[in-house]
Amino acid sequence: MKIVALGVNSKTGKCCIIKSNATYDMLKENYDLYKVEYDSINWCGRDDVERTLELENIKLTDNSFNHKETVRGTDYDHGHDYPWTFKFDIVYEVEDKNNY
């Protein structure tokens, strides 16, 4: 799974772009995440899908957070909930989120 998150450093006020599979110690600073975009294979294993999660200032105070989403398959009339654990790495910070 490929994940990119947008957020803001709650200490410095700078916006940041975060990517997955990181070893950065997130306990050193707190980040408020407000958007996550990721690519994954859907639950029936056929299609690569892109999903965007709109977050409301999730406090990232450790190395991950859990999100449960409902995935709907075209061949089924019901959804399935899957818990994801996202792990992030700070790539860089910018002054203005409009620079994304």
Which residues are covered by each model-predicted region?
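A short, exposed loop/beta-hairpin motif centered on an aromatic-Gly-Thr core
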Residues: 12-22
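Mature extracytoplasmic domains of secretory-pathway proteins
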Residues: 30-32, 36
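Short aromatic-glycine-(Arg/Gly/Cys) micro-motifs in beta-strand/loop hairpins
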Residues: 1-13
